[in-house]
Amino acid sequence: TNLDFIIGPLYPEQIAPLSKFCQQHHIKLVVPFSSLGDNVYENPYYYAINPPKSYQFAEASRLTTELFGKDNVIFLEGTENDKDAAAFIDATRKRLQQNGSKANRLKLNDDEIKWMETMTQYKDNVIIPNSSGIKLLNQLFPKLKEFTKKNPEYRIKLVGYPEWQTYASNHLENFYQFNTYANSTYYKNPLNVKDEEIDKANQNAI
């Protein structure tokens, strides 16, 4: 075969045989429509635009541990339940334990004394919320601003989720202020005019 790559297939049941074919013939396979199956683990020619969430969580937790494993990692519990966030936090917690590190836990509504006990002046405090929702951020940022105003010597970073990119119109300055990181398989630049043009075109097409 003289193919360089194949885009597809459309149906999930076609993925396994096509993946096998591409691996045998050294053809790159780009799968844009489905994240089902574990071919991404087994086939080096397999590129999943929407990879399995288990793979995303594993990679995100690995990068998080590499970047912040020596910092004061804090898992922040809000009032919402988020299965994806919980899976990411669990994977990160296990990786930290494997590396001999330990994360702290803090509740959003804990009092100031508890926040002071959990934070440290001697390391970066890396806060990972248990929700990707904007509701938690709306509650968290005022609390962080109040805390850092009273305690400017504390360094705080946030680690979050792909959805946070869509909150840039509300929280871009807050993201900058608290040195925010978000794991994601895509990136949307809120300051790029071309991104705005694409958004408008999509809205007009609906």
Residue ranges, per PLM feature:
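A short, well-structured beta->alpha microelement
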Residues: 1, 95-120
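Periplasmic-binding protein-like
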Residues: 2-10, 29-33, 72-78, 123-140, ...
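Extracytoplasmic ligand/sensor domains, especially the bilobed periplasmic-binding protein
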Residues: 7-91, 165-168
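A short acidic, amphipathic alpha-helical/loop segment
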Residues: 17-21, 63, 87-91, 115-118, ...
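Helix C-cap/helix->beta junction micro-motif
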Residues: 25, 99, 151-154
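Glycine-rich, charge-decorated loop segments at or immediately adjacent to ligand/cofactor-binding or catalytic sites
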Residues: 40-45, 112-118, 164-178
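Cysteine-dependent hydrolase recognition
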Residues: 75-77, 83-87, 91-106, 164, ...
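Extracellular/periplasmic periplasmic-binding protein-like sensory domains
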Residues: 141-206
